[in-house]
C-alpha cells in the first residue's frame, strides 16, 4: 500500500486524478482488454467465458462461420503452442470459393477446440532477469522468440 500512496501522490502533483468508480485495489485478479484476459499473481490467462464459447462452437457450415471461429481462437493464439500448424487446414478452406469440409479440416477443428481447453497461464516477465533471444527458421518461415532466462518453466508466450 505504500507504493500505491506514492503513485497517487505523484499523480496529484501532476494534476492527474484517478476515478474512484473505475478503480479496484487489492484484487487477487482483474479482467483486462474487455474481459478477454485475466491477470493475477500467477500470470495472464484466458477468460473462461470466451473458452466456453470456443469449445461450444458448432462445426462451421460456411466461410463466415469459419472466419468467426478463427477470429475468436486467433485472439488467443499466443496461448496455443503451434497454433499456425493446427489451424492451417482451416485457413486453407478460406482460400477457395466455397467451404468444402474435409476430414483434415474436421480433425484440425477438433484439435483446436481441444487445445483451447488446456490453455496455460502465461507468466508475466520479470524485468530484473535477463532475456534470451532465439532466431530460427523452419521450412518456409522464420521466427524470433524472447524467453526469460530463469528456472521457471511456465511459458511466457508462444
UniProtKB/Swiss-Prot annotation:
Cellular component aspect of the GO annotation: mitochondrion
Compartmental location: Mitochondrion
Mitochondrion found in the keyword field: yes
Record-linked InterPro entries: DNA/RNA_pol_sf, Rev_trsase/Diguanyl_cyclase, Viral_Replic_Matur_Polypro
Gene3D superfamilies linked to this entry: 3.30.70.270
Principal location listed in the UniProt entry: mitochondrion
Origin superkingdom: Eukaryota
Keywords associated with the record: Mitochondrion
Record keyword Mitochondrion present: yes
Misc. comment: A stretch of 270 kb of the mitochondrial genome is duplicated within the centromere of chromosome 2 resulting in the duplication of the gene. The expression of the duplicated gene (At2g07682) is not demonstrated.
The protein, known as: Uncharacterized mitochondrial protein AtMg00860
Origin species: Arabidopsis thaliana
Lineage of the organism: Eukaryota, Viridiplantae, Streptophyta, Embryophyta, Tracheophyta
Amino acid at each position: 500500500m505504500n507504493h500505491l500512496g506514492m503513485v497517487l501522490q505523484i499523480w496529484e502533483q501532476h494534476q492527474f486524478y484517478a476515478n474512484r468508480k473505475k478503480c479496484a485495489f487489492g484484487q487477487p485478479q482483474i479482467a483486462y482488454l474487455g474481459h478477454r484476459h485475466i491477470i493475477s499473481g500467477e500470470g495472464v490467462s484466458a477468460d473462461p467465458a470466451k473458452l466456453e464459447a470456443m469449445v461450444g462452437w458448432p462445426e462451421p457450415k460456411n466461410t463466415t462461420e469459419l472466419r468467426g471461429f478463427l477470429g475468436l481462437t486467433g485472439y488467443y493464439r499466443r496461448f496455443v503452442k503451434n497454433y499456425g500448424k493446427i489451424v492451417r487446414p482451416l485457413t486453407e478452406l478460406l482460400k477457395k470459393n466455397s467451404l468444402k469440409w474435409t476430414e483434415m479440416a474436421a480433425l484440425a477443428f477438433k484439435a483446436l477446440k481441444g487445445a483451447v481447453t488446456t490453455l496455460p497461464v502465461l507468466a508475466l516477465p520479470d524485468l530484473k532477469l535477463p532475456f534470451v533471444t532465439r532466431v530460427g527458421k523452419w521450412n518456409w518461415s522464420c521466427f524470433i522468440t524472447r524467453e526469460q532466462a530463469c528456472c521457471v518453466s511456465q511459458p511466457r508466450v508462444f
